[in-house]
């Protein structure tokens, strides 16, 4: 089998396709979570903390005075951008929470499927007991010997 054939076989497997779909959905989900944090959660946190925008919170480690993180980075100033880190932590916590809920839901579905009893098989009609069979054999033997 050539390397090309092995590669085709590898790609055709269901696990690889499932992984590809997961990566694509994950990338889209990351955009949704980033928007959720930047556009909805951070403004509420900023309102509670007196207008602080975490995405723009930084400490300038060099000389100069910059009004925004973007201006400091554009000037090449060394900055400690802990606000961006806080935003990344919030993103991570939201993604981890959603993944936890999804795993919990899948486990519940699996558990329900495992505990579901299989449908009862049709009861087969009861045949004659051993005593009844022996009695029939005895009758047949008596008829045959007579």
Swiss-Prot record:
UniProt xrefs under Gene3D superfamilies: Large-conductance mechanosensitive channel, MscL, domain 1
InterPro entries for the chain = Mechanosensitive_channel_CS, MS_channel, MSC/AndL, MscL_channel
Q: Does the keyword Chloroplast apply?
A: no
Instruction: Tell me how this protein sits in the membrane.
Output: Multi-pass membrane protein
According to the UniProt entry, its GO molecular function terms are: mechanosensitive monoatomic ion channel activity
This protein's assembly is summarised as: Homopentamer.
Q: Which family does it belong to?
A: Belongs to the MscL family.
The protein's name in its UniProt record: Large-conductance mechanosensitive channel
